[in-house]
Amino acid sequence: MKVSVVILNWNGCDMLRTFLPSVVRCSKSGQVEVCVADNGSTDASVEMLREEFPCVRIIVLDQNHGFADGYNLALQQVEAEYVVLLNSDVEVTEHWLEPMISYLDAHPEVAACQPKIRSQRQKEYFEYAGAAGGFIDKYGYPFCRGRVMEVVEKDEGQYDTILPVFWATGAALFIRLADYREAGGLDGRFFAHMEEIDLCWRLRSRGRKIVCIPQS
């Protein structure tokens, strides 16, 4: 398998119904699988997936392990060259995978990348979670292209260049599975939030590169 798109879910039945159709529709390829890793949901998520999305692979976890360990456990059951850690509230667009696949295929020194992320409600603006790639200032504060503190910019093509970044957002993290495993995966001590920054930091410490691919 070339790519596994893995969505972590916890009691998000309605959210999956809303956003999963775009992922399935825009990820049709014999070399791409779409997986939902269910983090011990108590709602009807698993039953709904089985009935309404038979093409989606379901990975059932025994309880809510949080974001980091939930993904670590799920990715133990995945075998693909690349994996995409995709939030359950992300709507993807046509051909979203191809630019990232092509770039990683051509640049073996790059461990991970992210697409441009725009707001789902105001599509002309960047999304707070990741925008156009993440950095860390000299005081250790994380920020993004397209976002300063709580203010997001309008996307006017100002960040349409492929650029090395310090960290890629966990909302849509495209990563080589080998790099993920060699770096030790996400740190479970980060139950939720900041875990992707820590992972990217460790990848960079190993001499690997992180890139934003705004064509995706």
Regions found by a protein language model. Give the residues of each.
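Short beta-strand/loop segment that forms part of the nucleotide-sugar
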Residues: 31-40, 59-61
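Short, acidic, metal-binding catalytic loop of nucleotide-sugar glycosyltransferases
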Residues: 21-31
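Conserved donor NDP-sugar-binding/catalytic core segment of glycosyltransferases
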Residues: 91-141
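A short, conserved alpha-helix in the catalytic core of glycosyltransferases
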Residues: 160-216
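Glycine-rich, basic loop-to-helix element that forms the pyrophosphate-binding segment
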Residues: 60-78, 88, 99
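A conserved acidic beta->alpha catalytic loop
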Residues: 22, 38-47, 63
